[in-house]
Amino acid sequence: MVIMTFGSGFQIENDSVSYLQRMKALNSYAADKGIAIGGYSLLASRGAKPKDAAISHHTGYPAKTREEGSRFGLSPCIASDWGSDYFKRLKNFFHTTGMNVFENDGSYPGDPCSSTVHSGHKGYLDSQWKQWNRISSFYQWCRAKGIYLNVPDWYFLMGSNKTPMGYVETNWSLPRSYQEVIERQNI
């Protein structure tokens, strides 16, 4: 199994015909070798334009800190129009390329959002639930298509095949030699 990341030049949200055809050819090559292939998407803490961001209940502006309501920094609200487009692009990628592995970093389970203009929720009180439903529906779609999922443990009952055991983001800020010990503990 190969999970490509943006560090390798992988761009799961790139919907240009030439890129998708290149990824389709790569998938065919991998499949001929008996290798499942797919990629990674950073969803949490990726940044967002103000109109797409999870809006703080405390400030009325995009949430950037835990005090403002964000778990991992400036993140998009996946119940916004941006979120709808994001999932359309992902579905198009998998449908067009035939790749069958997906690792998603987020949404943990989505920062609450006070926006009243996002198309996928009414306001603060329903925002996290609507985001949960949107991403859970996507994961269920993936599983119905046979796509292997490595996603946060909040979604294990929504179709995840694997979830990191003992994963803590701060582990990867440690010196490399400590990271190796942690990696081996998680195996």
Question: Where are the model-predicted features located?
Answer:
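Catalytic domains of carbohydrate-active enzymes, especially glycoside hydrolases
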Residues: 1-7, 95-101
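Aromatic-lined substrate-binding rim segments of carbohydrate-active enzymes
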Residues: 9-37, 120-125, 134-135, 141
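Aromatic-lined carbohydrate-recognition surfaces of secreted/lumenal glycan-active proteins
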Residues: 31, 35-50, 106, 131-162
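Short, small-residue-rich loop/turn micro-motifs
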Residues: 6, 106-111
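Histidine/acidic-residue-rich catalytic or RNA/ligand-binding cores of hydrolases
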Residues: 48-54, 112-120, 154, 158-169
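Active-site-proximal beta-alpha loop/turn segments in soluble metabolic enzymes
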Residues: 10-12, 67-76, 114-124
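Glycine- and acidic/polar-rich repeat regions and solenoidal domains
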Residues: 125-126, 177
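Active-site-adjacent "subsite" loops/lids of carbohydrate-active enzymes
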Residues: 18-99, 108, 165-187
